[in-house]
Swiss-Prot record:
Protein name (record): Serine/threonine-protein kinase Sgk3
Domain PX: 12-124
UniProt biased composition (Polar residues): 139-151
UniProt xrefs under InterPro entries: AGC-kinase_C (IPR000961), CISK_PX (IPR037900), Kinase-like_dom_sf (IPR011009), Pkinase_C (IPR017892), Prot_kinase_dom (IPR000719), Protein_kinase_ATP_BS (IPR017441), PX_dom (IPR001683), PX_dom_sf (IPR036871)
Organism: Rattus norvegicus
Keyword Kinase tagged: yes
Length: 496
């Protein structure tokens, strides 16, 4: 059976996972909802499903595809359905089920699967392979996919320089792995991307934009840094800081919400990182708890720069529809021009979630959530300070021109009374002790990563270099398309 995700099917092969589950109550009934992350190209969204919905899909598909031998965890007749170990085991089984669905075009293009994953929803149909403001610019005629993407760096690094130990994350183009460099025993997070998938989705520009942003991050303490990058004939490799305190999302799911001092500390470090990006004319555009990591001491580290927009000065705007539904600003939903203040809206949404446990306008129905973001007044419940209420109201202002940060950007956030007790100088110098210590056991501790990832087998293909003599023409063309991807820092810094 064919497993090619790039042939003449409706769209790119989706990537799916179940990062978490949550308990809900409705009309005095208690049930577990599983949060399914779906990625197709540069679009990404969440779908919330109960076990009964997985079971219904399974029963429909097993009759139509008996040879597939699909399976899901069995219904539990006796025992506690809300036992944490049972829910964890069931989530792993359901994750395996949906992973199998997206391996086969016959399955992931089936109407029941597409409906289950909401793949045909109009809100997921935008094609961000090009920015909207760039589509209107006429492009010179070209008959080749080969492009020069920057200066060539150090070509000597190779996959065999590393021992690849664990899968610690997944995306639509590849995986992130914990790797140990053989030369000095240092641990890194290595992001491995498939060139063929990147090319088929016309994403070279976004990959190189991410690389460019990463190169600038070494100057800021709360942004993940790129040590170097290299490529084989089939894959691209980013060698990044390994940050093992866990996603903010991971800790927030476990603790539901944070005390205000802890939320303030994280918000300040996030704001500092965003302020730095803005100072070098970069808008982040995709702030969410899943993209905010904690290091081994408990400091914030912002990661994943694939949706960053470069070259945006304080008065500039852009129009691309991108981001994650729960955190989209009103002007993005309306497809109106937006500016740096989109990041301050997202900061408000993340701060609100840290304090209250859910994003500010959250609803399981995404269309209704969009309507809430556009029209519903902000609901500020008791339990937080007046200055917290104030900054949430000002960051989550629906009119971007009146939003906190609209006039003087990061300076306005720094000067807000909510942060009055903080020394921003001490913060950037990491002199303020974090309010929470992840208590990692060492540089290779992965306890704060989801077992859905870490229990996966490390693919052998990421560990080897391809031989040019045996690759086909399309792979060689892919290699030409990424001229300039490889990067090495100055030699004195290479093995620090």
């Amino acid at each position: 059976m064919q497993r090619d995700c790039t042939m003449d099917y409706k769209e790119s092969c989706p990537s799916v996972s179940i990062p978490s589950s949550d308990e809900h109550r409705e009309k005095k009934k208690r049930f577990t909802v599983y949060k399914v992350l779906v990625s197709v190209g540069r679009s990404e969204w969440f779908v919330f499903r109960r076990y009964a919905e997985f079971d219904k899909l399974y029963n429909s598909l097993k009759k139509q595809f008996p040879a597939m031998a699909l399976k899901i965890p069995a219904k539990r007749i006796f025992g506690d359905n809300f036992d944490p170990d049972f829910i964890k085991q069931r989530r792993a089984g359901l994750n395996e089920f949906i992973q199998n669905l997206v391996r086969y075009p016959e399955l992931y293009n089936h109407p029941d699967v597409r409906a289950f994953l909401q793949m045909d929803s109009p809100r997921h149909q935008s094609d961000p392979s090009e920015d909207e403001d760039e589509r209107s610019t006429p492009k010179p005629h070209s008959t080749s996919r080969n492009i020069n993407l920057g200066p060539t760096g150090n070509p000597h690094a190779k996959p065999s320089d590393f021992d690849f130990l664990k899968v610690i994350g997944k995306g639509s183009f590849g995986k992130v792995l914990l790797a140990k460099r053989k030369l000095d025993g240092k641990f890194y997070a290595v992001k491995v991307l498939q060139k063929k998938i990147v090319l088929n989705r016309k994403e070279q520009k976004h990959i190189m934009a991410e690389r460019n942003v990463l190169l600038k991050n070494v100057k800021h303490p709360f942004l993940v840094g790129l040590h170097y990058s290299f490529q084989t004939t089939e894959k691209l490799y980013f060698v990044l800081d390994f940050v093992n305190g866990g996603e903010l999302f991971f800790h927030l799911q476990r603790e539901r919400s944070f005390p205000e001092p802890r939320a303030r500390f994280y918000a300040a470090e996030i704001a500092s990182a965003l302020g730095y990006l803005h100072s070098i004319k970069i808008v982040y555009r995709d702030l969410k708890p899943e993209n905010i990591l904690l290091d081994s001491m408990g400091h914030v580290v912002l990661t994943d720069f694939g949706l960053c927009k470069e070259g945006i000065a304080i008065s500039d705007t852009t129009t691309t529809f991108c981001g994650t539904p729960e955190y989209l600003a009103p002007e993005v939903i309306r497809k109106q021009p937006y500016d740096r203040t989109v990041d301050w809206w997202c900061l408000g949404a993340v701060l609100y979630e840290m304090l209250y446990g859910l994003p500010p306008f959250y609803c399981r129905d995404v269309a209704e959530m969009y309507d809430n973001i556009l029209h519903k007044p902000l609901n500020l419940r008791p339990g937080v300070s007046l200055t917290a209420w104030s900054i949430l109201e000002e960051l989550l202002e629906k009119n971007r021109q009146n939003r906190l940060g609209a006039k003087e950007d990061f300076l306005e956030i720094q000067n807000h009374p909510f942060f009055e007790s903080l020394s921003w100088t001490d913060l950037v110098q990491k002199k303020i002790p974090p309010p929470f210590n992840p208590n990692v056991a060492g540089p290779d501790d992965i306890r704060n990563f989801d077992a859905v990832f870490t229990e996966e087998t490390v693919p052998y293909s990421v560990c080897v270099s391809s031989d040019y003599s045996i690759v086909n023409a399309s792979v060689l063309e892919a290699d030409d398309a990424f001229v300039g991807f490889s990067y090495a820092p100055p030699s004195e810094d290479l093995f620090l």
